[in-house]
Amino acid sequence: AVAASELPDTINADYQLGGAYVPPAGVTIVVRDSTAKPAPGLFNICYINGFQTQPGSDWPKALLLLDTKGNPIADPNWPDEYFLDVSTDANRKAILAKLVPVIKGCAAKGFKAAEFDNLDSYTRTDGRLSAAHAVAFAKMLAAATNAAGLAAGQKNAPDLARRVKAEIGFSFVVSEECHRWDECRAYTDVYGKQVINIEYSDDLRGTFEKVCADPQPPKSTILRDRLLVPKGKAGY
């Protein structure tokens, strides 16, 4: 299959990682977890945790980043996720081998693209991992994704946007809170309109109306609750 090269012209996205629900009218793109089914008739992006473990998943200790005592290191922001050790080529190949079935599974279900979370996790490892390690593994992920017939997307890491777009050829980017942290231009200068941005209701810079009136964030910016509760549940 030939991978889609970019997102549809009309980017009205919905970000459904906390659980799938019928997208609102007018939505053209849906992001769902790799364990979910795509939304019928729309452009679906498959969420894959590319650089950390998913809560409850089973990974060999040899592929996890360890501290000096030999214990896996958890992400300080998400203590039930552990860093994957992408510091060596052998590890990168072994980690990729575990993720390729997930990528192929997304393609088989009918997803059109995949986004790989935690490209920026190296910034939270106290120097144990580097940007070079992250980029090297991202390149492998993107190649495997394109080989499966899916477009590959960058997730966050504005500092790497120009580099990974040039070196890897990511088709699009999914950013979180680029308006809140004044990072949107880092993405739009590189990816143009191929940007989906999510702002969270508990930490906006002004009202959402002000966010939308600001020319900096992409037109595809959407507002979500922090826990990404499915529509119809309390907190959505």
How would you name each of these model-derived features?
Residues 1-236:
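Glycan-processing catalytic domains of CAZymes
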